[in-house]
Amino acid sequence: MRLVIARCSVDYVGRLEAHLPSADRLLMVKADGSVSIHADDRAYKPLNWMTPPCSLVETPITDEDGEATGESLWVVENKKGEQLRITVEKIHSEQNFDLGEDPGLVKDGVEDHLQELLAEHITTLGDGYTLIRREYPTAIGPVDILCRNSDGETVAVEIKRRGGIDGVEQLTRYLELLNRDELLKPVHGVFAAQEIKPQAKTLAEDRGIKCVTLDYQALRGIESNELTLF
């Protein structure tokens, strides 16, 4: 990973045009080729970005006499011909790190057990539900559970111990990807957790995702209230 803190301006040229005026920003270049531009706000969200596959060409900027100005132009281009044109005026800091291969998200014991129990008792989501498989592989990571509802339609289930907005966003990305598969679509979503935050529930319902609160003890066969559907 390459991290560059620099004063720069950015122009996006593609389906539409956008401009970021000169300011100090973080430029992040990942090993997969992606490039993103960050400000010191917006949490994890970049101001602009280009996802792989894309190319990055860096060219020194010269004046009319052909002398180097100390600035450089980064041109990031994807296969569609869309470009990020980053004019780097001054580099404050630049570091490179080899992070190696990431092991991926490791669920805590309760989440993993919830997934196992729900897969064994998939009809807790509704009569007629059948399991396709756990940890259904996709290009952006495994879906916790893939199953079919009583109408024979595909359902993707994301399981969390405590369900927040990040979990809903993750499930949304899975649904967008899975619904491109002619053999699977339409794919519906279920967000299942022991506790679902109100903001996450509102966002999920707005996106047509069903929320399910899971009673861990009940799924383990210990006397408790049954799971509640919203």
Curated annotation (Swiss-Prot):
It is found in: Cytoplasm. Keywords: Cytoplasm, DNA-binding, Endonuclease, Hydrolase, Nuclease. It is an enzyme of class 3 (hydrolase). SUPFAM superfamilies: Restriction endonuclease-like (SSF52980). The keyword Metal-binding does not apply. CDD domains: NucS-like. One of its GO terms (molecular function) is DNA binding. Its EC number is 3.1.-.-. Disulfide bonds: none annotated. One of its GO terms (cellular component) is cytoplasm. PANTHER family: ENDONUCLEASE NUCS. Cleaves both 3' and 5' ssDNA extremities of branched DNA structures. Belongs to the NucS endonuclease family. This is Endonuclease NucS. It comes from Corynebacterium glutamicum (strain R). The lineage of its organism: Bacteria, Bacillati, Actinomycetota, Actinomycetes, Mycobacteriales. The gene is nucS.
